[in-house]
Swiss-Prot record:
GO CC annotation: cytosolic large ribosomal subunit
Organism: Nitratidesulfovibrio vulgaris (strain ATCC 29579 / DSM 644 / CCUG 34227 / NCIMB 8303 / VKM B-1760 / Hildenborough) (Desulfovibrio vulgaris)
Quaternary data: Part of the 50S ribosomal subunit.
Family: Belongs to the universal ribosomal protein uL15 family.
Gene Ontology molecular function: rRNA binding; structural constituent of ribosome
Gene Ontology biological-process entries: translation
Source lineage: Bacteria, Pseudomonadati, Thermodesulfobacteriota, Desulfovibrionia, Desulfovibrionales
Main function: Binds to the 23S rRNA.
A matching Pfam family: Ribosomal_L27A
Gly residues biased stretches: 21-35, 42-52
Protein name: Large ribosomal subunit protein uL15
Cysteines joined through disulfide linkages: none
Length: 148
């Protein structure tokens, strides 16, 4: 038996729905659309969200707030994860973080303070939490915040 000889069993293949082909097929006559009415007609049916003339939910609810298109979205990395990825390294740059795959390329990075710093390290990122800066400085290291 070769790869081109493989085929699914006939009962495993789902047959398409053939409508309007006689009453013996189970989908003859009205073709599964029921009797008369808007949904039985060609091109029939109502648009999404239509509630039969009642004021739709989308219009009943008030508009609120807005999305700030200039908001900066930071990808967060905890100190524990950062130190595990760069064990024994004294200086961690933003390019190192991107190369190691800790966050997606070009994204803004924020370092959070979960984990313990035992050695002096120099870390480069866009933002740091207060606890992360404190832990890095207490270990004799430096937290360098970048612009952008």
């Amino acid at each position: 038996m070769r790869l081109h000889d493989l085929y699914p069993f006939p009962e495993e293949r789902k047959t398409r729905k053939r409508v309007g082909r006689g009453s013996g097929s189970g989908l003859g006559c009205t073709s599964g659309k029921g009797n008369k009415g808007q949904n039985a007609r060609a091109g029939g049916g109502v648009r999404p969200g239509f509630e039969g003339g009642q004021m739709p939910l989308q219009r009943r609810l008030p508009k609120r707030g807005f999305k700030n298109m200039f908001a900066v979205k930071y990808e967060v990395i905890n100190l524990a994860r950062l130190l595990a990825a760069f064990e024994g390294k004294a200086e961690i740059t933003l390019d190192d973080i991107y190369d190691r795959g800790l966050c997606s390329l070009g994204s803004a990075v924020k370092i959070l303070g979960e984990g313990d710093v035992t050695t002096a390290i120099k870390v480069e990122a866009h933002k740091f939490s207060a606890s992360a800066v404190e832990k890095i400085r207490n270990a004799g290291g430096e937290a360098k915040a970048l612009e952008g």
